[in-house]
From Swiss-Prot:
<comment type="subunit">
    <text>F-type ATPases have 2 components, CF(1) - the catalytic core - and CF(0) - the membrane proton channel. CF(1) has five subunits: alpha(3), beta(3), gamma(1), delta(1), epsilon(1). CF(0) has four main subunits: a, b, b' and c.</text>
</comment>
<feature type="transit peptide" description="Chloroplast">
    <location>
        <begin position="1"/>
        <end position="55"/>
    </location>
</feature>
<keyword id="KW-0472">Membrane</keyword>
<comment type="function">
    <text>Produces ATP from ADP in the presence of a proton gradient across the membrane. The gamma chain is believed to be important in regulating ATPase activity and the flow of protons through the CF(0) complex.</text>
</comment>
<feature type="disulfide bond">
    <location>
        <begin position="253"/>
        <end position="259"/>
    </location>
</feature>
<feature type="active site">
    <location>
        <position position="143"/>
    </location>
</feature>
<keyword id="KW-0809">Transit peptide</keyword>
<keyword id="KW-0150">Chloroplast</keyword>
<dbReference type="InterPro" id="IPR023632">
    <property type="entry name" value="ATP_synth_F1_gsu_CS"/>
</dbReference>
<dbReference type="InterPro" id="IPR000131">
    <property type="entry name" value="ATP_synth_F1_gsu"/>
</dbReference>
<feature type="region of interest" description="Disordered">
    <location>
        <begin position="30"/>
        <end position="52"/>
    </location>
</feature>
<keyword id="KW-1015">Disulfide bond</keyword>
<keyword id="KW-0813">Transport</keyword>
<dbReference type="GO" id="GO:0045259">
    <property type="term" value="C:proton-transporting ATP synthase complex"/>
</dbReference>
<dbReference type="Pfam" id="PF00231">
    <property type="entry name" value="ATP-synt"/>
</dbReference>
<dbReference type="GO" id="GO:0015986">
    <property type="term" value="P:proton motive force-driven ATP synthesis"/>
</dbReference>
<protein>
    <recommendedName>
        <fullName>ATP synthase gamma chain, chloroplastic</fullName>
    </recommendedName>
</protein>
Length: 377
C-alpha cells in the first residue's frame, strides 16, 4: 500500500540563539488506519479532514533507513562545523586586540592632526548624500536563519536610508548575498565579491580597494560595514559599523555611535561525555593597551596616518570576514545538532509504528490460522 502522504519534512526552526535548526516532522499521524468504508455517502462534517494513511512494512523500513542515513549526514556535518568553528574563533579572538588598538592609535593621531589643522581625506566627515553598504553573508546554507537575519538587517538599513532621502549602493560579499541581490535588480550594487572558507588579508584587500576608491573619489560620503558579530557558540548578532570616515570616538562603533568592541571573549573546548559531543566554556576578559593622549612621533604624523589607514581598512574588513565565518559555522553546528536530535526522535517514532504494524500483521496471521483450523473441525 502506498505511503506517499507520510512525509518527512526538513524545515528551519529558530532556536534560542540567532541561528535556526533543522527539524523533521511527520505530516500525518502514523498511528491512524485508513477508512475502508468508502461505499457509503460521504459525511459532510468529515469531508475536510485529512485522510489517514496506512504505510506498509516495506515503506516504513525504507523510511527508517532514510532517516538513519540523514542522521549520519547531519551528525558528520555537526562534527565538521564544530572542528572548523574552533579554528575560526581563535582567528577572531586573535585579531580583535590588534584591530581595536589600531583604531585607538589612529584616533590619537587624528586628534593631533586636527589641532594642527591638517586635512586628511579618510578622516574628514562631510555631509552624507550617498552611502556604500558592504554586506557580508555566507557562501552555504544549512545554517538556520544566519543569512536571512543578515539580509533582513540590510533591508531595514536600506529602508532607513530611503526614508532619510540618502542614496546608497551595495557591495555584496558572499554567495548567498550575491544571489539575493542578483534576483533584485532594482537594488543598486556596485560590486559582487565571492567569500572564502578561510578569509585572508588578500580577500580583505580586494574589498578595501573598492571602498577606498569610492570614498576618496567622493562617489560616496560614508562606508558602512554590515556583518554578523560572533559573540558565542549560541549567540551572534548582525551589526553595522561605520568604516569610513574614521570613528570620532577612537573605538569601533555602530551607526548609532554604540561601541561594538568585545568586553570579553568566550573560549570553548570540544569534549565528549557519555559518547556525545559537549562544549566546555570559559569567559576571558578582553585586554587592551591604554595609550597616552599625548604621543611623540619621530616621523611626520601625516606620513604615519597615510601608512596606517590602508592597514586600518584591511584589518577592519578582515575582522568582519572572520567574525562572519565564525558565526556561520556556529549557526551550522547548532542547526545540525538540532537536526540530529530530531532525526533520532523521528527514527524512534517510525520504529514504534513499524513494530506495532508488524505485531498486528503477525497477530492477524495467527488468527487466520486459528480460524482455518476451527473451520476444519
Amino acid at each position: 500500500m502506498s505511503c506517499s502522504n507520510l512525509t518527512m519534512l526538513v524545515s528551519s526552526k529558530p532556536s534560542l540563539s540567532d541561528s535556526s535548526a533543522l527539524s523533521f516532522r511527520s505530516s500525518v499521524s502514523p498511528f491512524q488506519l485508513p477508512n475502508h468504508n468508502t461505499s457509503g455517502p460521504s459525511n459532510p462534517s468529515r469531508s475536510s479532514s485529512v485522510t489517514p494513511v496506512h504505510c506498509g512494512l516495506r515503506d516504513l523500513r525504507d523510511r527508517i533507513e532514510s532517516v538513519k542515513n540523514t542522521q549520519k549526514i547531519t551528525e558528520a556535518m555537526k562534527l565538521v562545523a564544530a572542528a572548523k568553528v574552533r579554528r575560526a574563533q581563535e582567528a577572531v579572538v586573535g585579531a580583535r586586540p590588534f584591530s581595536e588598538t589600531l583604531v585607538e592609535v589612529l584616533y590619537n593621531i587624528n586628534e593631533q592632526l586636527q589641532t594642527d589643522d591638517i586635512d586628511v581625506p579618510l578622516t574628514k566627515v562631510r555631509p552624507v548624500k550617498k552611502v556604500a553598504l558592504v554586506v557580508v553573508t555566507g557562501d552555504r546554507g544549512l545554517c538556520g536563519g544566519f543569512n536571512n537575519y543578515l539580509i533582513k538587517k540590510a533591508e531595514a538599513r536600506i529602508r532607513d536610508l530611503k526614508a532619510l532621502g540618502i542614496d546608497y549602493t551595495i557591495i555584496s560579499v558572499g554567495k548567498k548575498g550575491n544571489s539575493y541581490f542578483i534576483r533584485r535588480p532594482y537594488i543598486p550594487v556596485d560590486k559582487f565579491l565571492e567569500g572564502s572558507n578561510l578569509p585572508t588579508a588578500k580577500d580583505a584587500q580586494a574589498i578595501a580597494d573598492d571602498v577606498f576608491s569610492l570614498f576618496v573619489s567622493e562617489e560616496v560620503d560614508k562606508v558602512e560595514l554590515l556583518y554578523t558579530k560572533f559573540v558565542s557558540l549560541v549567540k551572534s548578532e548582525p551589526v553595522i559599523h561605520t568604516l569610513l570616515p574614521l570613528s570620532p570616538k577612537g573605538e569601533i562603533c555602530d551607526i548609532n555611535g554604540n561601541c561594538v568592541d568585545a568586553a570579553n571573549d568566550e573560549f570553548f573546548r570540544l569534549t565528549t561525555k557519555e559518547g556525545k559531543l559537549t562544549v566546555e566554556r570559559d569567559i576571558i576578559r578582553t585586554k587592551t593597551t591604554d595609550f597616552s593622549p599625548i604621543l611623540q612621533f619621530e616621523q611626520d604624523p601625516v606620513q604615519i596616518l597615510d601608512a596606517l589607514l590602508p592597514l586600518y581598512l584591511n584589518s577592519q574588513i578582515l575582522r568582519a570576514l572572520q567574525e562572519s565565518l565564525a558565526s556561520e559555522l556556529a549557526a551550522r553546528m547548532s542547526a545540525m545538532s538540532s537536526a540530529t536530535d530530531n532525526a533520532t526522535e523521528l527514527k524512534k517514532n517510525l520504529s514504534r509504528v513499524y513494530n506495532r504494524q508488524r505485531q498486528a500483521k503477525i497477530t492477524g496471521e495467527i488468527l487466520e490460522i486459528v480460524a482455518g483450523a476451527d473451520a476444519l473441525v
